[in-house]
Amino acid sequence: MQEQQYQLNSAVAEQREVSGVLRNTYGLLALTLAFSGLVAYVSQQMRLPYPNVFVVLIGFYGLFFLTVKLRNSAWGLVSTFALTGFMGYTLGPILNMYLGLPNGGSVITSAFAMTALVFFGLSAYVLTTRKDMSFLSGFITAGFFVLLGAVLVSLFFQISGLQLAISAGFVLFSSAMILYQTSAIIHGGERNYIMATISLYVSIYNLFISLLQIFGIAGGDD
């Protein structure tokens, strides 16, 4: 009887912890997306240039690893907003590039709507079914290296359709990451809401950029 009561108490405590992580993650994610969007708007309105690729890589990975190091302290929140603000800054020049196209406004609107639909749809699916998506870890690892190789190839060779294939690959990769990370929170694989937020934010960012490229290419063929 005592063992059953202990198991019940443990299950209740675990469920409370999961609910807390989910609540904190989605709350912080909403704030970082809003902050990132504000920075992107300012960057776009000021017509700031897109930074050098090395600046982007150093800025992103530097702030990312800083966030990992500070994830268990209040400073982790500061570095989280620094990272997402930096990514918002890089988004501004990209939006200006698409706004310069004849159908740029509709491309951005379509990419934004599809990103929201995919994120909310996948999140709702995992939260409702509570399926364990840990089996996606192998696909995610393999997908990362395949996409990395494809990106490197695209830097040196002009292959017809490769950019579209890379963008489609990133859509699948980002979708898998959303499923995996949401499932990890539910099933105990992730208990740090800062890391969960960063993972979901990066997935949403990559998903949006990839959909922008796909809709932009499709619109250019019209």
Swiss-Prot record:
A GO term for molecular function: calcium channel activity
Pfam families named among the record's database cross-references: Bax1-I (PF01027)
Report the GO terms under cellular component.
Answer: plasma membrane
Q: Any transmembrane segments, and where?
A: 26-46, 48-68, 75-95, 107-127, 139-159, 166-186, 198-218
Highest rank taxon of the organism: Bacteria
Where's it found, cell-wise? Cell membrane
Q: Which CDD domains match?
A: YccA_like
Query: Is Hydrolase one of the keywords UniProt gives this record?
Result: no
Q: Topologically, how does it sit relative to the membrane?
A: Multi-pass membrane protein
Q: Does the keyword Coiled coil apply?
A: no
Which UniProt keywords are given for this protein, alphabetically ordered? Answer: Cell membrane, Membrane, Transmembrane, Transmembrane helix
A single Gene Ontology biological process assigned to it is:
regulation of proteolysis
What InterPro entries does this protein's entry cite?
Answer: Bax_inhbtr1_CS, Bax_inhibitor_1-related
Its family remark reads:
Belongs to the BI1 family.
Q: What is this protein called?
A: Uncharacterized protein PA2604
Q: What is the lineage of its organism?
A: Bacteria, Pseudomonadati, Pseudomonadota, Gammaproteobacteria, Pseudomonadales
